[in-house]
């Protein structure tokens, strides 16, 4: 009898031991994946600086569109030294400009969007087709009528869809014209303000992942007049504004003005707006003019490339530094012998890169063997 009782206790102890071991195994099996594969948060999404942690356009690298004059000229260049210089421009993601007057603009935009999607990168474009563009300066052009412009904006919005994208809205649409004497109650000004607002509202309604930045010039406008211009131009529908497009003002100065402008807009009830700065040619702050053009940023051989596109900025409301103006393209016939605006200008391209490398502004990238 005693023997049976002892055996029963032994079996009971063994059974309990197996049960405990089994429970521990199950418990460990459930915890192991968390220990071996801890969930890693995306550091970009933790940055409070950007204001909105769900900005998809800034969660990916910028897309390099290769259908550019810089890329084409670099591929064709036979001189190894010049090829190396031009490559510094050609290999840097830069905003692609569209005016929407020619049919090929739509097909080019579609290729750009598809290319960016395939590489899971963010495209950057510039809308540059507003009627009476550039207020009669070197880059005059654009759509002939407001109706035509709106049709193009509708098409562009439809092509972009839900693609995460950065959109620069109409460089020099306000600053050039206001400096040339446009008044806030002029018919042309009112039409322009209405068209810019149309751009903002169209994208706000149909393109949830598009970040729009309305151009307000360099720092040549006073804060109050600049504020009235962007408010009239529908900045309430956009992420914010862009400054320094094609200009040579240094980044610290551009940021100082822009941070003050953010406060100016807040005081006018617009909430917090953000901005981007064109650093494509601002490596040297306001270089001395080298020709007789009426503005110093026109084919200036004293200028240098600025820092390459990045979201690592120095100011709380600066979303990014971008290359918006294409370095190496002519600003226009600023001096004798200068090519037309938008043409490849080898001498300017060479000078911009040389000065940037000399001053350590950009890292010199090696040209691939098969380029």
Q: Where do the protein language model's features map onto the residues?
A:
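Short, ordered loop/turn segments at secondary-structure junctions
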Residues: 128, 172, 217-218, 246
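Substrate-binding cleft of extracellular glycoside hydrolase catalytic domains
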Residues: 103, 111-212, 228, 235-237
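Bacterial N-terminal signal peptides that target proteins for export
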Residues: 1-10
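N-terminal carbohydrate-binding/catalytic regions of secreted carbohydrate-active enzymes
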Residues: 58-155, 159, 325-352, 356-366
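Bacterial N-terminal signal peptides
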Residues: 9-19
């Amino acid at each position: 009898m005693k023997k049976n009782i002892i055996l029963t206790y032994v079996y009971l102890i063994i059974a309990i031991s197996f049960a405990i071991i089994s429970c521990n195994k199950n418990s460990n099996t459930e915890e192991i994946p968390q220990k071996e594969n801890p969930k890693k948060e995306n550091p970009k999404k933790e940055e409070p600086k950007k204001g909105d942690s769900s900005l998809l356009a800034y969660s990916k690298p910028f897309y390099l569109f290769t259908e550019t004059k810089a890329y084409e000229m670099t591929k064709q260049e036979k001189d190894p030294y010049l090829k190396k210089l031009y490559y510094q421009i050609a290999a840097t993601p830069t905003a692609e400009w569209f005016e929407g007057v020619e049919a090929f603009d739509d097909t080019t935009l579609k290729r750009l969007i598809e290319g960016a999607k395939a590489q899971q990168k963010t495209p950057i474009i510039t809308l540059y087709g507003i009627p009476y563009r550039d207020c009669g300066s070197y880059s005059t052009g654009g759509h002939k009528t407001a109706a035509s412009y709106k049709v193009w904006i509708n098409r562009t919005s439809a092509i972009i869809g839900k693609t995460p994208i950065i959109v620069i809205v109409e460089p020099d649409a306000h600053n050039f014209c206001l400096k040339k004497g446009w008044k806030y109650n002029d018919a042309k000004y009112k039409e322009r303000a209405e068209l810019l607002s149309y751009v903002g509202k169209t994208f706000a309604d149909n393109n949830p992942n598009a970040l729009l930045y309305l151009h307000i010039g360099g720092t040549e406008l006073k804060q109050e007049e600049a504020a009235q211009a962007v408010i009239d131009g529908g900045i309430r529908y956009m992420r914010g504004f862009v400054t320094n497009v094609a200009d040579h003002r240094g980044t610290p100065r551009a940021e100082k003005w822009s941070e003050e402008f953010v406060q100016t807009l807040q005081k006018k009830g617009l909430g917090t707006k953000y901005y981007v700065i064109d650093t494509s040619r601002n490596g040297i702050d306001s270089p001395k003019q080298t020709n007789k053009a009426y503005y110093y940023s026109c084919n200036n051989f004293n200028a240098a490339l600025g820092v390459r596109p990045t979201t690592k900025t120095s100011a709380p409301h600066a979303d990014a530094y971008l290359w918006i103006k294409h370095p190496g393209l002519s600003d226009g016939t600023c001096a004798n012998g200068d090519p037309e605006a938008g043409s490849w200008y080898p001498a300017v391209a060479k000078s911009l890169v040389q000065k940037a490398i000399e001053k350590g502004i950009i890292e010199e990238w090696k040209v691939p063997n098969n380029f």
